[in-house]
Amino acid sequence: MRKVNCIKVITRAHTLGYCGGVRMAVRMAEHARAHHRGSVYTLGPLVHNPVTLARLRARGIECLDPAHLSFALHAPAAPGAAPHAVEEKTARTVVIRAHGVAPEVYEALERSGAQVVDATCPRVKESQRRAQGFAAQGLHVILAGDRNHGEIVGIEGYVRAGAAQACSHLPGGAPDGMLPQVQCFVVQNAREAAALPCLARAALLAQTTITQGEYDAIAAAARTRVRELTVARTICAATARRQAALRALAPTVEALLVIGGAHSANTQRLLHTARETSLPTWLVERVEDIPPDIYAFSAVGISAGASTPDCVIAAVEQALRTGGAPVASRVSSSALPKVSTCRAVCAAATSSVGSAGASGAVSPGAVRPFAVGSVR
């Protein structure tokens, strides 16, 4: 039996929900579906929120996984194929998600003849540009974040591109088969940063969704391993604002509810921030996930990750006020698209490009000259 609803005050964090980059990506995908002929795909999940993904799929926007990537890249008409079949395979649009992709993936899609809609977050684009620039100058690049996150995997590709540029600056160019001594490391915490090899010069960039505290700790550890370290400010202000708003909300409530996708990096960081307050804290993706125990508190604060749509926030707030779950807000988990790992997407595309030059696929975890690697 559900406990009596004792919630008297529900307070939203001052800043919560969709950030500008996610809102832009969703609108671009919906615009593509409304105005482009043929199939519309997103390359991997557009955002890490199951409700948003289900809504996009209901509108005819499919999530492309690695098993179907070859179809997107190479879709020649079969001999004797009917005209409508040719049109169905060639009139296709691929939307690059907010997290971005490696440049070789983008180039492979363009060569395939697909119409590419680039919905990469502008802040992520800036990180890509800076990472490529540092590598082109011959600096090693250290990325602070989740090594399997799409944003990090994409930025690694820009480090490869920058290292290739560094090659062109060598007198007479690089010898055949030789690549510049530019290495890229992905570190997920200060402990991994402290295990970096000793480096002369390197640049440190953050995944846009990590907390400032995490980044500061990683930077401090990296300074003990790098003689000359450039620390770039690449954390998204929207992420920092949501975390600050949650901290400001905490003293005024008895419990916290964070709304967002379980696989969303920014939502997980928000959840971590909430738990640091020592208040009872729960993560919910939709109304059905609201825990009965929360109704025992009289004052509840709510926040939401940057990929959480407004409609879900409103539905959860309504359910907290009424003690019930509105049927209209429910989305079946069976309707969610299959989510594939970002590295698999990147690997599938790079293998289609070929192994020559900077576009060669690199095994995750390997660290070698001009290799994208991870400190374990």
Curated annotation (Swiss-Prot):
A Gene Ontology BP annotation from the UniProt entry: terpenoid biosynthetic process
Protein name: 4-hydroxy-3-methylbut-2-enyl diphosphate reductase
Keywords: 4Fe-4S, Iron, Iron-sulfur, Isoprene biosynthesis, Metal-binding, Oxidoreductase
Cofactor note: Binds 1 [4Fe-4S] cluster per subunit.
Record has Lyase as a keyword: no
GO MF term (any one): metal ion binding
Organism: Treponema pallidum (strain Nichols)
Cofactor(s) it depends on: [4Fe-4S] cluster
Lineage of the species this protein comes from: Bacteria, Pseudomonadati, Spirochaetota, Spirochaetia, Spirochaetales
Pfam family, one: LYTB
Recorded catalytic activity of this chain's protein: isopentenyl diphosphate + 2 oxidized [2Fe-2S]-[ferredoxin] + H2O = (2E)-4-hydroxy-3-methylbut-2-enyl diphosphate + 2 reduced [2Fe-2S]-[ferredoxin] + 2 H(+); dimethylallyl diphosphate + 2 oxidized [2Fe-2S]-[ferredoxin] + H2O = (2E)-4-hydroxy-3-methylbut-2-enyl diphosphate + 2 reduced [2Fe-2S]-[ferredoxin] + 2 H(+)
Task of the protein: Catalyzes the conversion of 1-hydroxy-2-methyl-2-(E)-butenyl 4-diphosphate (HMBPP) into a mixture of isopentenyl diphosphate (IPP) and dimethylallyl diphosphate (DMAPP). Acts in the terminal step of the DOXP/MEP pathway for isoprenoid precursor biosynthesis.
Top EC category: oxidoreductase
Highest rank taxon of the organism: Bacteria
